[in-house]
Amino acid sequence: MSLTAHVYQIYIAATPEQVWSAITESEWTRRYFHTVAFVEPPQQGKPYLTVGVDGRPAVDGIIEEMLPPEEGRPGRFVQTWHTRYDPELAHEPASRVEWTVENAGRGLTRVRLVHGNLEQSPLTWENVKDGWVWILNSMKTLLETGQPLPRVSEDEILSPADRS
């Protein structure tokens, strides 16, 4: 059996609305997501493009679902994910990223991220597995302390076992 998705879950000491903003608004993403930001505000059913501070395309796709969290209902942000920041990855088919943002009580928000549809994208599979851990923890740190984790290179994100 081959694995086709990465699944992550974290708890953040912030409101679901704050977490939602951090996921969907460029003034937030640029601070914790490797300086990447949406070119235009994301809209359900519309294409999107993210770029780095240098203006180079990072990721593009379609926003499939954009349902902000409300009292008693989790938020969902679902996007297709076509990597553009690496020419080798750009040749692979688009995958799918699903964010779920839910009030967990006690001032906490549960964030679940599933990066799936990776069965035809082995390079993307490998590339994003450690990257999402860093991004999620940097978002958590930013929301809880006001400062993201320090910027690092992809090699610095890899676990020691993956560097060999």
List each model region and its residues.
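Short, highly charged C-terminal tails/helix-capping segments
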Residues: 141-164
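Hydrophobic/aromatic beta-strand elements that line small-molecule binding cavities or substrate pockets
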Residues: 8-10, 60-65, 95-103
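Hydrophobic pocket/interface hotspot
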Residues: 19-20, 29, 48, 63, ...
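Short beta-edge strand/loop motif at the mouth of beta-sheet-based domains
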Residues: 7-8, 18, 24-62, 71-74, ...
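A short, structured loop/turn motif at beta-sheet edges
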Residues: 16-17, 64-75, 100-110
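Beta-strand/loop substructures that line and gate deep hydrophobic ligand-binding cavities in soluble
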Residues: 84-133, 152
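Terminal, regulation- and interaction-focused segments at domain boundaries
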Residues: 1-16
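Short beta-strand segments that buttress and anchor functional surface loops
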Residues: 47-53, 78-84, 115
